[in-house]
């Protein structure tokens, strides 16, 4: 049998509450949130243990939401999972059923949701602060049989299940700081304020807290993602469990991404799919400092397969082949290729000092460009070939610097309260992306709270913008990862789960 939930109307910022009654199921209340023209509803079928939610509203997007929500309050770590279906034909492919966690019941509240759209699109959506715009991470899978939204500490993530019914990480997570208590529940938005749509949620499971097995080692989830510079809406391309992947390069034709894992290089279609190993001959301990020549014909690697296990730079054909040694001296870590394809830039340790060097792409005598005390690292060329951007801790904190390609004219670019690493100019010369750690983090370790930030190279007065906040660091964007049209960036994010 079915039981209606207590309903009340919540307009843009005004709350009107009808008499509260005891409710069945796991939720306590139900309401339309935001500017909703037609009232929605939520009912619970105790026999089938299912929830049917109808909702209107224009969207759950931008700076405010309009939908029907049924909820309970919780604190701490929490998960909510359900099978979601649309029993009737929807009038808009963007109508969606969601599993949702919200800070408040106001329309512009911070929130995160796992959204299944009527057309099968599946995504993790979020608003970081009150009144901010909504962002999303699209899963590289459609029409999953089950979704799970998980809040663990200050990170939120999505898992989905296919035909097997087994939930697996959908890839990508983001930082969302909520105070206790928060609201958790189910929602429906019709994406058309003149109609209501219906979704059924079955096998709803809500858990509070995570209890890992005694002595259990956290599992590593690596996700290769892309993000458009214009929308900032991320897309998970490829996800692995218990296998570290690092440092994607975008091929010049825009069709593939190259990354490293367990000492090997792999090529992956930019749309996702099965990765293919690239033959690197005897070089089977490739690290995360690799790239592709401007003409797309050659790959450069930094490999540690020699008996001394020190990194040296090699080149090989893009389709794979026998590596050619470029730097005899070690350790050497590649980071940049000149736009004309003739010169490689890299970080190397010589006589106890890490500095920036260049060498002809075919091998030869290396040229030292920096000699400041401390670490100079991460060199990458500007697309016009006039400058090399790099990071240096010569002033105390790690910051982005720039110099001419002969090493002269060294100038500091960033001067903020972060440690900034691995600057990469966009191919069109308009943007500089780099990785930022908190100022108290030493080095560029893995598994830290980091931000990808963008600095305009055409507006000298503009402050860096946050492109994405994630759990990452070492391996996220060590090397150039711009799409050839400068519209997107590839990177790797990580999760550690019990």
Task: Outline where the language-model segments fall.
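Bacterial N-terminal signal peptides
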Residues: 9-18
């Amino acid at each position: 049998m079915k039981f209606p939930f207590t309903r009340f109307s919540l307009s843009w910022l005004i709350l009107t509450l009808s008499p509260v009654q005891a409710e069945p199921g796991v939720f306590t209340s139900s309401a339309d949130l935001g500017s909703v023209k037609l009232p929605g509803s939520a009912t619970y079928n105790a026999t089938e243990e299912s929830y049917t939610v109808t909702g209107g509203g224009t969207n759950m997007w931008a700076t405010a939401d309009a939908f029907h929500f049924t909820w309970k309050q919780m604190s701490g770590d929490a998960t909510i999972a359900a099978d979601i279906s649309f029993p009737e034909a929807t009038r808009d492919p963007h109508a969606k059923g969601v599993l949702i966690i919200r800070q408040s019941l106001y329309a512009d509240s911070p929130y995160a949701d796992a959204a299944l759209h009527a057309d099968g699109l599946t995504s993790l959506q979020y608003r970081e602060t009150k009144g901010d715009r909504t962002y999303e991470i699209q899963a590289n899978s459609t029409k999953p049989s089950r979704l799970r939204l998980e809040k663990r500490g200050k990170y939120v993530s999505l898992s989905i299940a296919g035909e097997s019914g087994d939930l697996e990480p959908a890839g990508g997570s983001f930082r969302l700081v909520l105070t206790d208590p928060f609201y958790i529940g189910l929602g429906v938005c019709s994406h058309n304020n003149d109609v209501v749509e219906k979704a059924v949620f079955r096998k709803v499971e809500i858990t509070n807290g995570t209890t890992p097995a005694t002595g259990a080692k956290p599992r590593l989830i690596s996700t290769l993602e892309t993000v458009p510079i214009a929308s900032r809406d991320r897309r998970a391309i490829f996800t692995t469990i218990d296998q570290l992947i690092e440092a994607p390069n975008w091929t010049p034709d825009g069709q593939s991404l190259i990354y490293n894992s367990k000492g090997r290089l792999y090529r992956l279609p930019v749309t996702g799919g099965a990765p293919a190993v690239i033959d690197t001959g005897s070089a089977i301990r490739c690290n995360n400092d690799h790239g592709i020549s401007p003409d797309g014909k050659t790959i450069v690697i930094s490999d540690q397969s020699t008996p001394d296990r020190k990194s040296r730079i090699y080149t090989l054909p893009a389709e794979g082949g026998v590596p050619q040694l470029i730097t005899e001296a070690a350790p050497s870590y590649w980071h940049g290729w000149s736009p004309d394809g003739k010169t490689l830039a890299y970080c190397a340790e010589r006589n106890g000092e890490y500095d920036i060097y260049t060498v002809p792409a075919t091998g030869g005598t290396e040229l030292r460009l920096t000699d400041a005390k401390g670490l100079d690292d991460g060199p990458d060329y500007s697309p016009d070939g006039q400058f090399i951007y790099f990071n240096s801790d010569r002033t105390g904190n790690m910051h982005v610097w720039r110099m001419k390609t002969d090493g002269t004219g060294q100038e500091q670019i960033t001067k903020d309260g972060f440690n900034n690493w691995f600057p990469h100019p966009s191919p069109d010369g308009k943007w500089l992306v780099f990785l930022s750690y908190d100022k108290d983090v030493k080095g560029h370790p893995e598994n830290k709270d980091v931000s990808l930030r963008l600095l305009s190279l055409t507006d000298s007065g503009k402050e860096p913008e946050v492109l994405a906040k994630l759990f990452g660091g070492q391996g996220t964007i060590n090397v150039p990862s711009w799409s050839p049209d400068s519209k997107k960036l590839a990177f790797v994010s990580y999760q550690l789960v019990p």
